[in-house]
Amino acid sequence: MTEPLSVQQMAQRLKSADNILILCHKNPDGDTVGCGSALYYALKALDKNAAVLCSDTVPARYAFTNAHLFKGEFEPETVVAVDVAGLQLFGEGNGVPRYSRHVDLCIDHHAGNSGYADFTLLDGSAAAAAELMYRVILEMGVDITPHIADCLYTGVATDTGCFRFSATTANTHLVAAKLIEAGCHVEELNTLLFDTKPRARMEAERIARNHLEYYLDGRCALIYLTRDEIEQTGVDPADLEELTSLPISIEGVKVGLTLRQQPGGSYRISVRTAKGVDACAIARRLGGGGHNRAAGCELLGNLENAKNAILAEVEAELDAPQEDA
């Protein structure tokens, strides 16, 4: 069972540690990469030995974060997870399981965090883990340099859909304002993160749009990409994350589903919902999780089986009495 920590307590433990390994989640997004990189540079500012490790390759769009990736050059004494809600999200690549089996510290904003770490700083009201990381770094006594600000802004902006998602709060905007004051390159980052799409990404979107299907009297929209189609386009898997917003953007749709076949044949399913429909409840019943309006899971089997399984849970959720989510 994990022991909860305050921001101050987490900062103190990090200041007292050394030889620190920072773990990101598999299929890394801007929040986990941004948090991991920001913490890395904060620890280096305190003359700590640190590195970042992820089971998957960091997407090219986040290469500017430029944190040192762990190559086994030291024996970690403290393992810190950032933006990782459960053990199953660490992945199997790059030797991660050797270190993820015992995590000392966790900084996260997923309300469904499984409590796998010895000590956890958790705030489910934060729109991004980067909001928490900003407070931790300040409490560590480290200046927010322009580069640290860039890393943190990446986390905040990407996890909120450039401040459009419902989890965005006044505090989210306040943190972003502080990062801009610290020298964050906001225009360049917004262009890179939201306004620049590789040709391969556009081709994948074209294929996915051609697969658009409606279910449950138009209340659910679904798109999918098979492994062959993903490989055919040559798209970076990280660039497919943006596709998840397509189905839910359609007028009248309450649940948007995006299915992407993984290298092993399973289907990774992203669930996005309109207000009042709990995406996390849908995903959780299939072994996944996430947030109220954005969640996901992974299912074994062929495309039709994956569709049938997720659609059954969507129907159950849509037909259940709803509360504001």
Predicted regions, residues:
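Glycine-rich, phosphate-binding/catalytic loops in enzymes
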Residues: 39-40, 96-99, 122-123, 174
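Short, motif-level signal for alpha-helix interfacial/capping segments enriched in acidic residues
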Residues: 2, 6-9, 85, 136-139
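A generic local secondary-structure boundary/capping motif
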Residues: 11, 68-70, 93-96, 120-123, ...
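Short alpha-helices
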Residues: 110-175
